[in-house]
């Protein structure tokens, strides 16, 4: 039962250091394997329209990073798979669960993507289980990620249906308002939800949402994530597809949720909002900084690789991360 677990989120946790065994943080290996491929970092930009487009996906794949292309350009998905495969790059796409998606999946036999993410807000659903089974029947070699979920029961059901990984997080993201609109979600206790779900998982878990700092990546690994999906930290770059808007001489980029009226084009069943983020530099600069910060985290863990973060002790001190720093 959930009540047996302490409830906390990223800002409530600090990891406890161990003796360092490497001479330089540069020796720490941040790579992670998901399915048949190994990637430079255990992070993936959120599959949202203001985070990545085909060009960003290509840049990530060429750089050795995992990506998941969003599902909001449905007609462009097959040409995208071809574009990536023609360059010797992995193809990683998203699908929904509507009836026409079944025919779409069946069309992929000729040019099969390495990864498919079933991407709906409430992933513990018969419709998702049915789609997992369909993909596995039609494309048995494709790695299937299913989500989003927030309970151990959901993780087990999706794994049993054939999912190769589950995505955990119901509404903790910066532009997600699910918890406000519906009363449901993992916002405010996403890290505890991740821990709860990970204890039931036999296959990889992708933590999705609520990441506000690079240190949250290490915390996610500690509590059971194999990969971490990140939205706001990857939004607002020069390469980001979001519109650039000038306000009082300062450059901003728009960032909106996948269930917002800005994505849907209509105000119906809205569970996302739009915000403006100060424009950042290049995406690669953020990826490099994430890698360096994760290398430092591994060194503090007394480890040499990402998996060593899973064994560190931690302390729960509510909202302690910004103690003594009034600017936050």
Curated annotation (Swiss-Prot):
The active site is at residue 176. One of its GO terms (biological process) is purine nucleotide metabolic process. The keyword Oxidoreductase applies. One of its GO terms (molecular function) is GMP reductase activity. Keywords: NADP, Oxidoreductase. The keyword Oxidoreductase applies. Gene3D superfamilies: Aldolase class I. InterPro entries: Aldolase_TIM, GMP_reductase, GuaC_type_2, IMP_DH/GMP_Rdtase_CS, IMP_DH_GMPRt. It catalyses: IMP + NH4(+) + NADP(+) = GMP + NADPH + 2 H(+). GO terms for cellular component: cytosol; GMP reductase complex. Its EC number is 1.7.1.7. Pfam families: IMPDH. NADP(+) binds at residues 205-228. Catalyzes the irreversible NADPH-dependent deamination of GMP to IMP. It functions in the conversion of nucleobase, nucleoside and nucleotide derivatives of G to A nucleotides, and in maintaining the intracellular balance of A and G nucleotides. Belongs to the IMPDH/GMPR family. GuaC type 2 subfamily. This is GMP reductase. It comes from Streptococcus pneumoniae serotype 4 (strain ATCC BAA-334 / TIGR4).
